Amino acid sequence: MLVLSGSSGRIETERCRLLAREGMTALSFRWFGGVGQPPGICEIPLETFAPAIEVLRAYGARRIGVLGTSKGAEAALHLSVLLPGIDAVVAVSPTSLTWANVGPGNDGRERPYRSSWTWRGEPLPFVPYDDSWAPDPAPPEGAPVAVRGLYEHSRRTFADRLGAAAIAVENSRADLVLVAGGDDAMWPSLPQAEELAARRRAAGLPVRLIRAADAGHRPRFPGEGPAPASAHFLYGGSPAADAALGAHAWPHLLDVLRGTRGHRDGLRPRPVRRVPRQ
């Protein structure tokens, strides 16, 4: 299982340990902000993740899954479309679109906006941010900000770019679980998850959408403590609501990663590849 954090850049050690306790091989690594990497999520080659997937195969993983949160979910969804052999994706607080960069690229610049991702040397089509947006009402100086409105405003401004920037989950053969909270203050993850689910269903492909109206951007799985507060951003939800959503999603996550019980919920497990035992 490849475990990807979002724009925090955190290596998901705690989450990997939770999965290891369930008998899974789990791996997380730094994919931006390290030596020789772009300092921000700016034109990250999606090929960056392929060696980690090969490491999991070398350790005998019989199913390859990617668990991503926020921008990590954006990467996970793209990988399931572009890389062969990914069996399952769990996208937590996902987006249905490719967005512009978050932070600077290798040139040290954040502007002009560029795609967050590249594939085979070419940037993926993306939605830029409309810098005319401002929070309304304005928060007190120095207080953390909810930036969900920026994404909603940018979708309206650049409506002509949404089609090209849509993540083509209808072309992914991976089993898919989406986890999203309706009170997400970072971006509109629940409406975006609903868009992803609709694309899958229209293509006749399985999907599970696990949602809670009162949860925020950072659902917490059983065994994880509350997410720390940020001095810069509001994430929505509450410790109780975020933990409840994570607890509800956890068995679905385990099912799809193991390839078990899927037929009961409209998810048909993919055949297990013949590789060394885990």
Feature roles, as predicted:
Residues 20-21, 58, 171:
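Residues at the C-terminal ends
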